[in-house]
């Protein structure tokens, strides 16, 4: 058997012993957005440290626990704090939580993050629906022997972000009168912020927002046949777009300010997605 698969399976076995909860939607919360989980009807909370072998987030603003419960009547599994490649974890560990949530029963993966705005039309506090991604600057989580239990060797990436879910997000934002941007997200390894020259490169190859997560998670989820959608909270203009130095504190503060609007948007999206799952 494959060691990576065995590790995910062992984590699944442990979580399954802690709860019988079966999520339909998996939600990953980015920097500063973690308080959303406090608003749902909570069924179970599992700290990552309770799961032997599970990677633990070390980043400020990432709590490091699963919250399982209901948004309205939709069963969701929320990651309050993701792990990042720059923390020193292998890419297989970075995407282990995604694979676990799929094993738990989640059909949809809803990714969120705080990112730097590359597009000149973006301002801090804007929301960008991710329509495509660039992940060429970080290792693919699919490198190594293919894990047949998860998916095929060469998965297609033409429509990573599900078009029906994108339409759900558009309608949700329109219903709430939230100005929704759209664009391509690029993941760079971090933990250092990007240089102005790197941002010029990102812009030249078609990126609208930049961050240090998300794209690798989408690759793993796509491999397993999950439906994927994503929203970036534009926390700050990327290097060279603004002349101010970038700090993680600024990212958190900006995400905190956007949180109330973000929470409404996510709730509306999940309710609409849940209805589509029942059809």
Residue ranges and their predicted role:
Residues 1-157:
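Metabolite-binding pocket within alpha/beta catalytic cores that recognizes anionic/polar moieties
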Residues 102-105, 203, 222:
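Non-catalytic positions within long, well-ordered alpha-helices that form the structural scaffold/packing
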Residues 107-108, 208, 227:
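Short acidic/polar active-site loop segments enriched in Thr and Asp
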Residues 134, 138, 142-191:
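Histidine/lysine/aspartate-rich catalytic loop segments that bind and position anionic ligands
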Residues 166, 172-208, 266, 273-277:
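Active-site/ligand-binding-proximal alpha/beta "capping" segment
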Residues 212-250:
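Zn-dependent metallopeptidase/amidohydrolase metal-coordination segment
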Residues 239-279:
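His/Asp/Glu-rich mid-to-C-terminal helical/loop segments that flank catalytic regions of hydrolases
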């Amino acid at each position: 058997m494959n060691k990576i698969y065995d590790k995910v399976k062992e984590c699944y076995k442990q979580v399954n012993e802690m709860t019988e909860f079966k999520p339909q939607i998996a939600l990953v919360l980015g920097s500063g957005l973690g308080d959303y989980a406090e608003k749902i009807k909570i069924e179970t909370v599992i700290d990552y440290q309770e799961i032997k072998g599970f990677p633990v987030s070390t980043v400020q603003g990432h709590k490091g626990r699963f919250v399982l419960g209901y948004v309205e009547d939709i069963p969701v599994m929320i990651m309050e704090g993701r792990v990042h490649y720059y923390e020193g974890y292998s890419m297989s560990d970075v995407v282990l939580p995604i694979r676990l949530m799929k094993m738990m029963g989640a059909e949809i993966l809803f990714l969120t993050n705080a990112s730097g705005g590359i597009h000149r039309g973006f301002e801090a506090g804007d929301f960008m629906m991710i329509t495509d991604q660039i992940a060429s600057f970080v290792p693919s989580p699919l490198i190594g022997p293919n894990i047949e239990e998860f998916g095929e060797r060469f998965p297609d990436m033409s429509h990573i972000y599900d078009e029906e879910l994108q339409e759900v997000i558009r309608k949700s934002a329109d219903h709430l009168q939230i100005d929704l941007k759209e664009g391509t997200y690029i993941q760079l390894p971090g933990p250092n912020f990007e240089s102005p020259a790197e941002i010029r490169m990102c812009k030249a190859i078609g990126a609208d927002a930049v961050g240090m997560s998300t794209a690798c998670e989408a690759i793993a989820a796509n491999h397993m046949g999950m439906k994927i959608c994503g929203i970036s909270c534009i926390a700050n203009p990327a290097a060279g777009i603004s002349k101010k130095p970038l700090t993680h504190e600024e990212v958190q503060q900006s995400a905190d300010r956007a949180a109330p609007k973000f929470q409404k948007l996510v709730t509306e999206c999940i309710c609409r997605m849940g209805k589509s799952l029942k059809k």
